[in-house]
UniProtKB/Swiss-Prot annotation:
Residues 602-617 have a biased composition (Acidic residues). This is Chaperone protein DnaK. The keyword Hydrolase does not apply. It comes from Methanosarcina acetivorans (strain ATCC 35395 / DSM 2834 / JCM 12185 / C2A). Belongs to the heat shock protein 70 family. Keywords: ATP-binding, Chaperone, Nucleotide-binding.
């Protein structure tokens, strides 16, 4: 059976895993790393770069590099411009997914068409739909969208058998934060509540360090660096490195030589010490936000910290000592550390993929919707149909009516959020139901049904009970894409894949040609009298032809001249090999004869003459 890929599509890093022999296995990327930076860029030559190679060139090419695109998933009007072309967040995310898919296929030696992709528990409908669209553009059928904390609990609890446990999952990633309360038992993973912030993560901690460095440099040198993209990229890398180092040491040095040039033309360097205490002070309000979400999640699940059996930390940012201390102080429990926080979510996604593919038995995942769903009613009131933390999939319906006599149609305004006033919530869509027969206000009965599927994506259905007429309403989600747009983007992605393949082939052809030239020149030098002058001149001519072809851009010409050089070198290489073989055999034979004679026997060299063809005649 074909493998289903489990993907943690992260803000700063992504990870992939599959089920192998009943276990979830994290797959390395082409560079050998188990995580891939969620960075996309284009080189100055127009080559698409994804992952570590994109991150490496960001300092010298910041305007053609994009980070943390996940923060903009579901934003209808957000676009990025790379290499003169605009892209949606879905397309950028698809490039990351495409890299993971391609490299998983290369590692496994088989085609992958299906995936389970994780999202923050607090992602709304538009963000989930955008993630699914990104998978489609990358050529993946997304079988399921699951919440990241839930995936982490699967990674933790798969081997825990029938032990009943209540778990708090604290997930602080690069750009998002979630906390979920789950109950495990008998193979059932039931989410009781979830809370979080889709715009809070490790990036925000990095930004505090960047702001500090900018302020310190301005204070000491009187220069504002905040407008220079290349310098900001260097500061971003330095801030991230400092944050990571401060998890293991109490002070770190940020040293960036030749950062800029002063008014007098003298180079300016940055050399600033940052202590862990300073770092914790400048980020304490960010940690306080996570505490608010933990309190809310526990309150919604009707549990107290004392009721918890385990606390799991997920996401690279949870390595910060202040995070560990905060969670431990709040829950009264030491966090469970037997799971790699960078890999737990991908492992959980692979387990869910195994459930869907039939490889994993006796596991049932019951997730919840993170936000209340409802519609706007008379007076701008938000009337809920599905409350937050309702187990999904679920379907709820309610009867509504007209607000005026003989009203021929009603507009239904679909909302997501916790506020009592419609305008304070997020609009998921609007639709109008026409053809209502004339009647006094309050008489027509319009049934509106909300249906949330297992991916947490909303579908709405409306029915006029008076006429029996039923309509399925398709909400145009903010940030969602039409089938035609997805199809166009799929073709664009395929086109890029072909371009990448062609460019790779061109590079390999040129590399092979240059290697052959070096080998041929070495062969000529070492050939001696094994090669005739005619053979040598043919090889030298073929070398010059190939060098000339390499100066141009015609790959086919390079291939042809490479083959010609191979043909010219072949007879010489063959002759050299045969000579070496004969010499080895001769040496072996002489050694054998000497051994047979013993030490006292005289060795007599025989005179011989090489008879050429002319003398034979």
């Amino acid at each position: 059976m074909a493998k289903i890929l489990g993907i943690d599509l992260g803000t700063t890093n992504s990870c992939m895993a599959v089920m192998e022999g009943g276990d979830a296995v994290v797959l390395p990327n082409a560079e050998g790393s188990r995580t891939t930076p969620s960075v996309v860029g284009f080189s100055k030559k127009g080559e698409k770069l994804v992952g570590q190679v994109a991150k490496r060139q960001a300092i010298s090419n910041p305007e053609n590099t994009v980070y943390s695109i996940k923060r903009h998933m579901g934003e209808a009007n957000y676009k990025v411009t790379l290499n003169g072309k605009t892209y949606t967040p879905q397309e950028i995310s698809a490039m990351i997914l495409q890299k993971l898919k391609t490299e998983a296929e290369a590692y496994l030696g088989e085609t992958i068409k299906q995936a389970v992709i994780t999202v923050p528990a607090y992602f709304n409908d538009a963000q989930r739909q955008a993630t699914k669209d990104a998978g489609s553009i990358a050529g993946l059928e997304v079988l399921r969208i699951i919440n990241e904390p839930t995936a982490a609990s699967l990674a933790y609890g798969l081997d825990k058998g029938d032990v009943d446990q209540k778990i708090l999952v604290y997930d602080l990633g690069g750009g998002t934060f979630d906390v979920s309360i789950l109950e495990l038992g008998g193979g059932v993973f039931e989410v009781k509540s979830t809370s979080g912030d889709t715009h809070l993560g490790g990036d925000d901690f990095d930004q505090r360090v960047i702001d500090h460095l900018l302020a310190e440099f301005k204070k000491t040198e009187g220069i504002d660096l905040s407008k220079d993209k290349a310098i900001l990229q260097r500061l971003k890398d330095a801030a991230e490195k400092a944050k990571i180092e401060l998890s293991g040491v109490t002070v770190t040095n940020i040293n960036l030589p030749f950062l800029t040039v002063g008014p007098d033309g003298e180079p300016k360097h940055m050399d600033i010490d940052l202590t862990r205490a300073q770092f914790q002070k400048m980020t304490e309000d960010l940690l306080e936000k996570t505490l608010v979400s933990m309190r809310r999640a526990l309150s919604d699940s009707k549990l107290t910290p004392n009721d918890l059996d385990k606390v799991i930390l997920v996401g690279g940012a949870t390595r910060m000592p202040a995070v560990v201390e905060l969670v431990e102080n709040f829950t009264g429990k030491k966090p469970y550390k037997n799971i790699n926080p960078d890999e737990a979510v991908a492992i959980g996604a692979a387990i869910q993929a195994g459930v869907l593919g039939g490889e994993v038995k006796d596991v049932l995942l019951l997730d919840v919707t993170p936000l209340t769903l409802g519609i706007e009613t008379l007076g701008g009131i938000a009337t809920p149909l599905i409350q937050r933390n309702t187990t999904i999939p679920t379907k709820k319906s309610q009867i509504f009516s007209t607000a005026a006599d003989n009203q021929p149609s009603v507009e239904i305004h679909v909302l997501q959020g916790e506020r009592g006033i419609a305008s304070e919530n997020k609009t998921l869509g609007r639709f109008t139901l026409d053809g209502i027969p004339p009647a006094p206000r309050g008489i027509p009965q319009i049934e509106v049904a909300f249906d949330i599927d297992a991916n947490g994506i909303l579908h709405v259905n409306a029915k006029d009970l008076g006429t029996g007429k039923e309509q399925s309403i398709s909400i145009q989600k903010p940030g969602g894409l039409s089938d035609a747009e997805i199809e166009r983007m799929v073709k664009d992605a395929e086109l890029h894949a072909e371009e990448d393949k062609k460019r790779k082939e061109e590079v390999e052809t040129r590399n092979n040609a240059e290697a052959l030239i070096n080998a041929a020149e070495k062969t000529i030098k070492e050939a001696g009298d094994v090669a005739t002058e005619d053979q040598k001149s043919k090889v030298n001519a073929a070398i010059e032809d190939l060098k000339k072809a390499l100066e141009g851009k015609d790959t086919e010409e390079v291939k042809a001249k490479t083959e010609a050089l191979q043909e010219a070198v072949y007879p010489i290489s063959t002759a050299m090999y045969q000579k070496a073989q004969q010499e080895a055999q001769q040496a072996s034979g002489e050694a054998g004869s000497a051994d047979a004679r013993g030490p006292d026997e005289t060795v007599v060299d025989a005179d011989y003459e090489v008879v050429d063809d002319e003398k034979r005649k």
